[in-house]
Amino acid sequence: MKKTFLKSILLSTLTLVSLFSCGDGFKFIISGLDKPSDNTELKNSNSDDQNNIDDKNEFTIFSINDFHGKIEATSAYNGLLALQGAIRGNPKYTEDSPIVSAGDMWQGTYVSGFDKGESLTKLMNDFPISAMALGNHEFDWGFSKIESNQNKANYPFLCANLIQKSTKKRPDSIKDHIVLDIDGFKLGVVGAMGAELESSIKSSRIEDFEFSNDTNLLKNAITSCEDEGAKSTILVLHDDKDSTYTNTIQRSKLNFKGIFGGHSHSFQLEQSNSIIPYVQGGCDSNGYSYMTFSKTTGALKDINYVNVDSSMASNATMDLIQKTNNLIDSIPTITYGTSTGRWNKTNTTNFVLQAMFYAAKKKYPDKNYTTETLVALHNNSGIRGKFTSGEMTNKTVQTVSPFDNVVTILPNREVNGTLLETAGSKPYCRSYPNSSGWTTKRTMDIVTIDYLVSDRYSAALSPTKPTPAINLENDKGEDYIIYDVVADYIKYLCQDGNVINAADYN
C-alpha cells in the first residue's frame, strides 16, 4: 500500500458506535459506578472539565490491550497511528504519561506476523510503551520467540504467574514487575495472565510452562514494588473482569489500586466498595483505557475507557508515522485470487473448512474421500476475521487464519454432531459437511488442525486412538499450515480467472 493511500485511510473519519464489531462484537460492560472503593477518589465522568488534569499533582497512565497486530489502518481497524494519536490527544496525556500493554500484541495480521511480531515490538519502542504483560497469543510462536522479541524491546515483558516447570520459577527473561518514575512519583506495575488461559495455547508451545493461580506471586511482586519506593501499584492483567482468576485476585484483597485488563476484547469498567477497580479498552486498535492518580495521596482519581477515531492518526508523532509507513511499504502484497459478494464470519469459516477438505482429498487421492467418509473441523475462535469482496491477498488470509496450526488427519474416528462440534455443552466448532444434525455415530476420517488434536475436547479428537494422527505435508514435504491451505485453495478456485462467490459458502 502506498504511503499516500495509507494516509488517506488513516485520516478518514470512522466513528465507532457503541455496538460496533470487534471480531464478533464489542462488549460494553459498566458495573457499580455508584460505589467508589476505599482506595479511590473517582470522578468517573466523561465531561471536559473532568477529563482535564486538575493540577500538577495528578498523572495519568494509559493502557492498550489485544492489539493483535493491527498496524495498518483499514475499513475495520483504525491502526497503530490512530491509537497513538488518540492517546496523545487525550487532555490527560502529558509527555510523562506512561503507556502499558495488557497483552496479545503481535498475532493477527500479515504485517505483524511475517516476522512473528519483531517489527511491531520495535515500533512499540517508539509508541512508546513502558511495559507489556504477556497474553496467551504471545505464546503462539513459542517461548523462544517471546525471548527474541524481548531482546528487541526497550520495555520489559511482565508475567508474575508464568512458571517454568523444570525450575519451578519464573523464567529470568520475564519480569514480574517494574517501578515507573513519573515526574517524581513512583508507580509499581505488576503483570500477569489469566491462569485458566493455559488451555487456549497449543500444548506444544508451552510444554515446560504453566500459569499459576497462586496470588502470593502477585503479593510478592507488590512487596518488591514497595521496597523500590512505589507509592501505589497497579496490575496489568491479560484476563476478563469476570474470570475465575480475576475473581480470585479480587477475593485476595491485594493492594492494587487498579487493574488494566484484556483478553475478552471488551470495553469493561467496574468499580464497587468490595473490589479493585478494573478497566479494559476494547481491542484491535479501536480503543484504550486509562487511570489518573493523585501524586499527593497515591489514590486513584479517575478510571475509564475511550473509543478511538481513525482521524486521530493526525496526532501521531512524525517518527512513528515514518517508521510505520516504511514497515507497511516493505511488506509485499501477494494476490491469490478475487471474490465477490457479502462475506461474514460464518461463510468465511465454511470456506476455510472446504479448503481443508480439498487439501485432504488432494493429499490422499487413493482414499476417494467424499462427504460420507471425511469431515473437516475447525474451532470457531480460530477464525479471527472475515474475507472482503475484491482481491484475496496474503494480508486478508492472515487476518482470517493467523495461527501456525498444522492441518492434520485423524483416521477412523467414530463421530456424531455432539462429539465434533461441542466442548462440554457449548458450541465450539463448525464442520463440513455440517454435522450438527448427526444424532447417530458414524466412522469417518477427520481433517482438522493440530491445536484441536487433544483428549480434552472430545474422544473423537484423540491424537492416538484408535489410530495416530497424521500431519499433512505440503509439496515441499513440510508441515502444511492452515494459512497455506487456505491460500492454495483460493489459487485453485481462481485459476483461469474464476471469481469466488461468498454466497456459495453461506
Model-derived regions, located:
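Bacterial N-terminal signal peptides that target proteins for export
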Residues: 2-10
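Bacterial N-terminal signal peptides
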Residues: 11-18
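Bacterial Sec-dependent N-terminal signal peptides
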Residues: 18-56
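Acidic/polar N-terminal loop/beta-strand segments that form early-domain functional surfaces
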Residues: 23-25, 64, 102-104, 380, ...
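Acidic, metal/ion-coordinating pockets
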Residues: 53-311, 355
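Catalytic centers of hydrolytic enzymes
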Residues: 57-58, 67-70, 92, 126, ...
